[in-house]
Amino acid sequence: MSEVTTIARPYAKAAFDFAVEQKAVDSWLSMLLFAAEVSKDDTVQQVIHSSMAPEQLAQLFNQICGEQLNEQGQNLIRVMAENGRLSVLPAVVAEFSALKAELDKELEAQITSAAALSEAEKVKIQKSLEARYQRTVRLNCQLDPSLMAGLVIKIGDDIIDASVRSKLNRLAEALQS
């Protein structure tokens, strides 16, 4: 786990718990996404990493965000600025999104295939994964011709490698031993 994730997690958890309590998870996600995009701006990055007083930084950041942040969202920005943590806002969004997915019983599957998958293949893979994990699964597909054929599925810490490349690698290892 990266240091940024370790720093971001408590902020995301606090915001998420509050959002669940207020029944406002989607609006909080929107606020955090907007604030994270603002924090990625080059000019804003320079200000975040400058020697500006935390109170001034929070006030400036909240002014830039304007009405996109409610009072509680502005309070989160203020606390993060006071602790010198505004630079981890994108990681806070990632952690918040993961908590939301857990609440919604959703998983994201990273599918890497040697060739483009047809819609029928995607549906079949999605249904199989949903049956296995008992959750709604969103597919994120990408191509990697180096797999030769087959695919690799990553969900959280689980990896299902059904690629020709890995089978050839295992065969080569078996022949060498």
Swiss-Prot record:
Topology in the lipid bilayer: Peripheral membrane protein
- Where are the coiled-coil regions? none
Q: Where in the cell is it found?
A: Cell inner membrane
Sorted alphabetically, the Gene Ontology cellular component annotations on this record are: plasma membrane; proton-transporting ATP synthase complex
Q: Name one GO molecular function term.
A: proton-transporting ATP synthase activity, rotational mechanism
User: Could you tell me which Pfam families the record lists for this protein?
Assistant: OSCP (PF00213)
- PROSITE patterns linked: ATPASE_DELTA
Name where it mostly resides.
Answer: membrane
Sorted UniProt keywords? ATP synthesis, Cell inner membrane, Cell membrane, CF(1), Hydrogen ion transport, Ion transport, Membrane, Transport
Q: Which Gene3D superfamilies match?
A: N-terminal domain of the delta subunit of the F1F0-ATP synthase
Q: How does it assemble?
A: F-type ATPases have 2 components, F(1) - the catalytic core - and F(0) - the membrane proton channel. F(1) has five subunits: alpha(3), beta(3), gamma(1), delta(1), epsilon(1). F(0) has three main subunits: a(1), b(2) and c(10-14). The alpha and beta chains form an alternating ring which encloses part of the gamma chain. F(1) is attached to F(0) by a central stalk formed by the gamma and epsilon chains, while a peripheral stalk is formed by the delta and b chains.
What PANTHER family does the record tag this protein with?
A: ATP SYNTHASE DELTA CHAIN
The UniProt function text for this chain reads: F(1)F(0) ATP synthase produces ATP from ADP in the presence of a proton or sodium gradient. F-type ATPases consist of two structural domains, F(1) containing the extramembraneous catalytic core and F(0) containing the membrane proton channel, linked together by a central stalk and a peripheral stalk. During catalysis, ATP synthesis in the catalytic domain of F(1) is coupled via a rotary mechanism of the central stalk subunits to proton translocation. This protein is part of the stalk that links CF(0) to CF(1). It either transmits conformational changes from CF(0) to CF(1) or is implicated in proton conduction.
Similarity-based family: Belongs to the ATPase delta chain family.
What is the name attached to this protein's record?
ATP synthase subunit delta
What is the protein's species of origin? Tolumonas auensis (strain DSM 9187 / NBRC 110442 / TA 4)
Q: Which gene encodes it?
A: atpH
